[in-house]
Amino acid sequence: LAQLGAGGAVCFASGFAEAAGEDASGSDLQARLVAAAGDMPILGPNCYGFINALDGALLWPDQHGCKRVDRGVAILTQSSNIAINLTMQQRALPIAYTVTCGNMAQTSQASIAQALLDDPRVTAIGLHIEGFGDLRAWEALARTAYDRGVPLVALKSGASDHAKSAAISH
């Protein structure tokens, strides 16, 4: 896709670094994916992609409960299962974006959240975080969100050894 000039891609497939405990070649496969992508941004692997309910665009392989909205919250999580469940909420929370980032082989959760802040129709960002990578990127995100008056709501999971193991393998 990168050679064809695609603007980006979503890798829905699993069996990459998240499966390294069962298949040692998963990490190598993920490295080859990143190398093949080059400068082309990719979400995933091991994710459901994204739903843009503002513009009616999505790369999402399953059912969801999002409806078109003019403005609303962005939800960003590594977990596709959590994302699906959140889109099915019936509380009339206007969801502008739902983005799953899976393994974050190339594009980090903090950088995706920074990009979501660039849309003035986003009123808040909800983050389900399984692990922090570059802390400076998270600090920059918090600073940008504060400066723009966009609340960040973060739920950090995977603190215990058992939870960390589950977060890595799910």
Per-segment meaning from a language model:
Residues 1-170:
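Catalytic-core regions of core metabolic enzymes
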